Design a protein with these regions (language model features):
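Hard-cation-handling environments
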Residues: 13-221, 226
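Short gly/pro/ser/thr-enriched loop/turn and capping motifs at secondary-structure boundaries
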Residues: 1, 166, 261-262
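Conserved protein kinase catalytic core
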Residues: 129, 262, 282
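A C-terminal functional module that forms or caps the active site or interfaces directly
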Residues: 224, 229-272
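A charged, well-structured terminal subsegment
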Residues: 2-6
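Single conserved hydrophobic/aromatic residue that forms the stacking wall/gate
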Residues: 273, 277-282
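Acidic side chains
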Residues: 123-126, 135, 251, 259, ...
């Protein structure tokens, strides 16, 4: 292309606030499709900035390229000005609350629901793809200590996930169906909760994942804890199915990925965000 235009915007927004499912993100990104049809415009891009990168250069930007100088510059300025005008209108794509309230609402939902769709809690404060260490044990510790959740006939729960090289080492020397014990979590971030000595039944083992390296499922009563050798976000249904877990039919699904990709979003019965380690307060 002959021309490129770039406009910086002094804004930082987490992904949980810039979803195209809701306004104003829907209208902001919707401008691209409308304006790309202008003569001499090849491509338009909008970046919301990486809210977890503590660098002076970090900010939102609009970039356009094409062969028509006037249109390329005009479009860049138009979108950048619109972005700035709606900067205070961005909200979380789902309700946010404390973990304690999330658990209370999950239990209420399970008692009242009219379908088998899971209650999803996204622990965005420990999201390894957005500023979190991915190994904070605070949430898992609360769940394991909750008598309404951690019991033989309790709700079926999938917790994804917690790194635990110590437990992984022990699990790889254990047969499926046998009991295994080992420490998990708090290797990088123990500010909120120490490592947990996890004890349960080895349900499944998966080796060779490019992110996790090794994955195992440890069942504690009805709580299925995914333990990894290295931290890994669980975005897709296939991530669970290869571990013999069915997120569509579980009662409560806890993930650490912030906003949900469409296939997880579509199976939710209810969705809440909670936060502990890495806060989404960027102002």
């Amino acid at each position: 292309p002959k021309y490129k235009a770039w406009s910086d915007i002094p804004i930082l927004l987490p992904g949980e606030k810039t979803s195209t499912r809701v306004e104003p993100g829907k209208s902001l990104y919707g401008k691209i499709e409308k304006l790309e049809d202008k003569k001499g415009v090849i491509d338009i891009g909008i970046w919301t900035g990486y809210a977890w990168g503590d660098k002076p250069r970090n900010r939102a930007a609009v970039v356009a390229i094409g062969d028509n100088k006037k249109n390329v510059i005009g479009i860049t300025e138009e979108i950048a000005n619109y972005f700035w005008s709606i900067r205070n209108d961005f909200e979380f794509v789902a309700p946010t609350t404390t973990l304690e309230n999330s658990i209370d609402q999950a239990i209420f939902y399970l008692n009242e629901r009219k379908n088998k769709k899971p209650f999803i809690i996204s622990d965005m404060g420990d999201n390894p793809t957005a500023g979190g260490s991915g190994d904070v044990t605070w949430t898992l510790n609360k769940i394991l200590k909750n008598e309404k959740l951690n019991k033989i006939n309790g709700p079926e729960i999938i917790y994804a996930s917690i790194p635990g090289p110590d437990l992984i080492k022990n699990a790889l020397n254990t047969k499926i169906g046998d009991e295994v014990t080992g420490y998990v979590g708090a290797i990088h971030d123990d500010r909120f909760s120490p490592p947990i000595l996890l004890k349960g039944t080895l349900k499944s083992v998966e080796l060779g994942d490019p992110n996790a390296d090794a994955e195992v499922v440890i069942k504690v009563n009805n709580i299925n804890v995914i333990v990894t050798n290295r931290r890994k976000p669980y975005h897709y249904i296939s991530d669970f199915e290869k571990l013999a877990l069915n997120p569509k039919n579980t009662d409560i699904l806890i993930v650490k990925i912030g906003y949900l990709v469409p296939e997880l979003y579509d199976i939710r019965g209810c969705l809440l965000y909670t936060s502990d380690a890495a806060d989404d307060e960027t102002s």
